[in-house]
Amino acid sequence: MPFLQISLLSIGVAADAFACSVVRGTAIQVNLFKRALVLAGIFGVFQAAMPLIGWFIGRFFAGITFIAEIDHWIAFALLGIVGTKMIWDAFQPEDDETIVDDGRVQFRPAIILGLATSIDALAVGMGLAFVEVSILKVALSMGSITFALSLAGAWIGHHGGGKFGKWATILGGIILIGIGANIVYEHLSA
């Protein structure tokens, strides 16, 4: 998988974490850098670990002969489902949850959000088990891009940019669907 495709895939799966960081950033009133760094670190670690876990699960099933014949369709379906769900979720009404800022780093909510926003990376990792790719490069790219975008998202949210999260999620969904379609196209044109 080329570098550009890995980068786009990483941006696509990082969109949910970016959106959550923007929302969390709107509530941060003190200790912005420290709290944004912790949030971005947690999101980055989850986004790096989950595709590895998914890849190992996918590789377990990749050896089954009939799956090898349809592997490109599996990758397309997983990426398409995750991308479509991201777009769908972006148009759903938001909860009117008010986040109270007590000035402390809140690890538990960050870990829950990190897990929730990385489920798509798990599915992507499963799909990538069926194509030729260096999963370590993908995992490092996903983790580092998620870290950077989450850090930026918290800063943007803190400075009044709460509306960016929705559009980032939509763009991320479109990117994932496009990469899935490209996998099928490359297989069918080979």
Curated annotation (Swiss-Prot):
Subcellular localization, as worded in the UniProt entry: Cell membrane
Gene Ontology MF terms in the entry: manganese ion transmembrane transporter activity
Residues passing through the membrane, by range: 3-23, 37-57, 72-88, 111-131, 138-158, 164-184
UniProt topology in membrane: Multi-pass membrane protein
Function description: Probably functions as a manganese efflux pump.
UniProt-listed InterPro entries: Mntp/YtaF, Put_MntP
Taxonomic lineage: Bacteria, Bacillati, Actinomycetota, Actinomycetes, Mycobacteriales
Source species: Corynebacterium glutamicum (strain ATCC 13032 / DSM 20300 / JCM 1318 / BCRC 11384 / CCUG 27702 / LMG 3730 / NBRC 12168 / NCIMB 10025 / NRRL B-2784 / 534)
CC terms in the record's Gene Ontology section: plasma membrane
Name this polypeptide is given: Putative manganese efflux pump MntP
